[in-house]
């Protein structure tokens, strides 16, 4: 996968340990997310997220990526390919910089990501949403995702 093709508007690259400070900066400002998804972010929790893998997945399938405008981190995404099954992509996190929220940037990133993943042959995209978080549920719903399972997290899915 060529991650640069996940967005038509932003420069996309993998994020690594050198990026923890800028990820932490945008994460800290997204306080509403952490009201529903405690504990509050730490630099260690970011590092752990970068390394976390679901069962039976390898780092070849994981893309912890940033979307940049000039040198500013606009959003970060944790994307797992072929999870939970083949031809389903799973977005474990999409965090949009608060300075870019409420103007369609997150939706544009989701739309571009969906278009590219469909070109690659993916059939569905799933996300896990904190059950009590109305802001996240609304965001994913307005982007065409439907709740397919309600447990601790709502699993939402978009058929491509």
Give each language-model segment a name.
Residues 117-128:
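Conserved GNAT acetyl-CoA-binding A-motif
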Residues 101, 118, 141:
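Short polybasic/polar patches that bind polyanions
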Residues 104, 121, 144:
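Short glycine-rich hinge loops at helix-strand junctions in the catalytic core
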Residues 107, 131-149:
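Conserved active-site alpha-helix within GNAT-family acetyltransferase domains
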Residues 5-20, 25-92, 97-99, 112, ...:
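Acetyl-CoA-dependent GNAT
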Residues 97-99, 103, 131-132:
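Active-site acidic-Proline motif in GNAT/NAT acetyltransferases
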Residues 1, 153-160:
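Terminal substrate-recognition subdomain of acyl/acetyltransferases
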